[in-house]
Amino acid sequence: VDYILGEYLSHPDRTELHEAFSSFKDKRYRYVRCDQLLHDSETNEVYLSPWLKDKKDGHPEFYQRLTDLLKNCGIEPKELKCTRDYWARDYMPVQLSENEFLKYQYYPDYLMKSKNPEDAETRTECANVLRGMGISCRSTKLIIDGGNMVPCGPYVVMTDKVFTENGKEKGDEMFKAELESELGHPVIIIPWKMHGDFNARDTDKYGHSDGFVKWCGGNSILMGNHGDQYPEEAA
């Protein structure tokens, strides 16, 4: 028991566990692992959507430069199937450890609530892509955007847009506990605010934490200087 409990960052004491055992199925216990997430430098395969090389909607020159660079590094990139846009990070499962992937519900408002009906048509159904890939995933019913999950050591950094995407008030502690329970790691929430018209193409309506933070190892992170554009929010 001590060995199992030692795998978690926090847990009720043994007495509380025994007392609550009879109603265990009806309770949500938040056991959060303290081991590190799998980071980019520890992975060994790169998958790209073929949309990235599409001459009309993609960026074929960038695709060629990127794949050449990967091959020069001894990495043979692989292509995904059944994708509808090239932002694979946003809709593909998040890799939590060597053999653990989590598939989430990808229904971003910037696609599903856009006034342009073509935007919703670009939503990729992850289940279709996963067929034949040989990847075993567990699933969550929570609505998450892959671009809004940045692994930082044992933590996952997300903007507070994840609350509104799931119909919750920002700061809802019960929802945050559920989110951490599904991810199996503690979540750090950073604030985000949309500026401009939702339907304008140049408006940042995405709320992605990967545009704010990058883990550099240890206790170091690289952050964009948000105060350059919105000094009133950087106080």
Map each language-model feature to its residues:
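The feature marks the mature, well-folded catalytic cores of soluble enzymes
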Residues: 1-235
